């Protein structure tokens, strides 16, 4: 529920961004979402007492890297929005390639931290982390995809 509210807020803010204030708005929303997300992750990921420090240190590292990828995704979304009315095949191909590369980087980031969490804690904690992270990433991807205008072939 918290995540849905945060995603709705993020979507509303993103839809009203202009190029000059985009960076500040993105930083603000990421910090708000990050705080709420960490509380949500804490509800689902249950490392043992001896594992907590190691898990949360890795989680914070992961979040820093994920936020950088998130900023790049927002830049791509803004580029798509700015060029939507005049979207050429060439620009569509470039954007698609960048989006696919970013999605792969994000998925590789999750996989690398699942391994790190498993090694620093145990496989059950790693599975908990993976499950909640995949759920949240899927929700974000669905929210973004459903709010984007669908490109049409221009004749």
Give names to the regions the model predicted.
Residues 26, 40-120:
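Amphipathic alpha-helical segments
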Residues 25-28, 32-35, 39, 44, ...:
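Amphipathic, charged alpha-helical segments and their helix-to-coil junctions
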Residues 1-24:
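Bacterial Sec-dependent N-terminal signal peptides
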Residues 7, 17-19, 42, 71, ...:
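Intrinsically disordered, low-complexity segments enriched in polar/charged small residues
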């Amino acid at each position: 529920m918290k995540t849905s509210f945060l995603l709705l807020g993020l979507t509303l803010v993103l839809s009203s961004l202009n190029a000059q204030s985009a960076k500040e708005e993105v930083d603000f929303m990421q910090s708000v979402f990050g705080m709420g997300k960490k509380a949500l992750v804490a509800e689902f990921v249950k490392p043992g007492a001896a594992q907590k420090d190691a898990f949360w240190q890795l989680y914070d590292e992961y979040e820093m890297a994920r936020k950088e990828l998130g900023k790049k995704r927002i830049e791509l979304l803004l580029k798509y929005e700015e060029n939507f009315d005049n979207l050429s095949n060439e620009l569509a191909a470039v954007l698609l390639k960048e989006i696919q590369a970013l999605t792969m980087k994000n998925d590789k980031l999750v996989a690398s931290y699942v391994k790190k969490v498993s090694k620093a804690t145990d496989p059950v904690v790693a599975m908990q982390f993976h499950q909640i992270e995949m759920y949240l990433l899927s929700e974000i991807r669905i929210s973004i995809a459903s709010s984007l205008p669908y490109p049409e072939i221009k004749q």
